[in-house]
């Protein structure tokens, strides 16, 4: 298939999964190095899922000064961070087992309510320098982060000025059996200068093409990342 030529995104396409993972890793490594050089410290937000996991494993082997890097999450399921279905567990076991000196900032705090965790996440991100990069994924339903089409909370999540919100995705197939979420919002993403969308497979490209032609972010929430001003969304797609 022919990838779309759209001025709203910067598209890099690959045929080899290894080349794809190495290219994304190099880009993230360069962003982190530049941020550490300029500010003395860097912060990176990561998504869950099997697609970015390959990149995290590769990034963990890079000779970065991990003691100067904070790792946060784009979104999280309302689960214990120790649960194997949580994004925190995935990041710990793909990246942090090797990059042991990085500081991890999970979204879920044991003993706190969902709303308290959202409050803490907003305090953390608003009282710190903005993350230098965010790694995003996209579901076959067009969701990114935990912004699910069909959620009754989606309109508020898209319009809020808060960086993080709680979202109930009950009834949304893409959310599976974990409807309660904490998610980064478009407002939170807008302050992050480098936004990378990682995609694998022809179906994901078809979804992206449909989203690019769609006019309503409520139908394809990935549009919230595509339509943000300033830096264009950088899409790394492996066929």
Curated annotation (Swiss-Prot):
GO terms for biological process: carbohydrate metabolic process; pentose-phosphate shunt. Its EC number is 3.1.1.31. GO terms for molecular function: 6-phosphogluconolactonase activity. Pfam families: Glucosamine_iso. Gene3D superfamilies: 3.40.50.1360. Keywords: Hydrolase. Hydrolysis of 6-phosphogluconolactone to 6-phosphogluconate. This is 6-phosphogluconolactonase. It comes from Xylella fastidiosa (strain 9a5c). The gene is pgl.
């Amino acid at each position: 298939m022919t990838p779309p030529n759209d001025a709203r995104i910067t598209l890099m396409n690959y045929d080899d999964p290894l080349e794809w993972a190495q290219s994304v890793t190099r880009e993230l490594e360069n962003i982190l190095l530049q941020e550490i050089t300029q500010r003395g410290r860097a912060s990176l937000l990561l998504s869950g899922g099997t697609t970015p996991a390959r990149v995290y494993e590769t990034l963990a082997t890079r000779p970065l000064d991990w003691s100067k890097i904070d790792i946060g999450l784009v979104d999280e399921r309302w689960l214990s961070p120790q649960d194997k279905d949580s994004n925190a567990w995935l990041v710990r076991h793909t990246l942090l087992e090797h990059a042991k000196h990085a500081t991890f900032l999970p979204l879920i705090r044991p003993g706190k309510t969902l709303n308290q965790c959202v409050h803490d996440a907003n305090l953390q991100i608003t009282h710190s320098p903005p993350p230098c990069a965010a790694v995003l994924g996209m579901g076959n339903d067009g969701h990114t982060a935990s912004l699910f089409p069909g959620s009754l909370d989606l309109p508020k999540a898209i319009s809020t000025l808060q960086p993080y919100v709680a979202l109930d995705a009950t009834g949304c197939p893409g959310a599976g059996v974990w409807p309660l979420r904490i998610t980064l919002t478009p407002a939170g993403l807008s302050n992050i200068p480098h936004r990378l969308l990682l995609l694998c497979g022809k179906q994901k490209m078809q979804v992206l093409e449909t989203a690019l032609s769609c006019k309503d972010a409520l139908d394809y929430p990935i549009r919230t990342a595509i339509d943000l001003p300033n830096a264009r969304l950088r899409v790394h797609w492996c066929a």
